[in-house]
């Protein structure tokens, strides 16, 4: 298990991009993952770091509740994006062109390239994920795999 306290200390005052899977683990209270995510979520809530994500995360998060017509979950997810909790990046031309470059040069899946590009264009120092491909292939940002912090 990695040193959570040291990582949180390094992230203080920084912009941290949350990949979709981190928010899924928290919203779904996913066993074996949520405990590794909550300290980062708490740090954003306490204002010790700035939590960021991309608009595409909203689309990814809404798929499951839309399939099941779960209005409560849809409302909860939308409120996360409507409030001041996370800074949400639009996917503009600059970030999409960078995503294409990352896809072409680093072999990332397009969705992962879009997330990574949004984080880079949004001046995030860290990207928090549990996606092995991003962890192994993304360059241009420090990728932090929450798997290192699981109990």
Where on the chain are the PLM-derived regions?
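A short, flexible beta-alpha/helix-coil linker loop
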Residues: 22-24, 58, 96
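Active-site neighborhoods of divalent-metal-dependent phosphate/nucleic-acid chemistry enzymes
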Residues: 2-5, 86-132
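Conserved glycosyltransferase catalytic-site signature
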Residues: 20, 55, 112-116
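Short loop/helix-cap segments at secondary-structure boundaries that form the rim of catalytic
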Residues: 134-141
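Short acidic-hydrophobic, aromatic-tinged amphipathic segments that line or gate anion-handling sites
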Residues: 88-91, 143-147
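Short, well-structured N-terminal submotif of metal-dependent ribonuclease cores
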Residues: 1-53, 66-79, 132, 144, ...
């Amino acid at each position: 298990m990695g040193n959570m306290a040291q990582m949180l200390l390094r992230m203080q005052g920084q912009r941290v991009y949350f990949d979709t899977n981190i928010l899924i683990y928290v919203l779904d209270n996913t066993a074996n993952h949520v405990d590794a995510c909550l300290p980062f979520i708490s740090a954003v809530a306490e204002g010790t770091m700035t939590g960021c994500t991309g608009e595409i995360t909203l689309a990814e998060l809404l798929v499951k509740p839309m399939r099941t017509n779960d209005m409560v979950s849809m409302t909860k997810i939308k409120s996360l994006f409507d409030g001041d909790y996370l800074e949400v990046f639009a996917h503009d031309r600059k970030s999409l062109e960078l995503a294409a470059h990352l896809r072409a040069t680093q072999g990332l899946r397009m969705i992962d390239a879009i997330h990574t590009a949004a984080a880079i264009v949004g001046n995030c120092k860290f990207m928090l994920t549990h996606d092995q491909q991003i962890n192994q292939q993304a360059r241009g940002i420090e990728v932090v795999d929450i798997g290192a912090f699981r109990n």
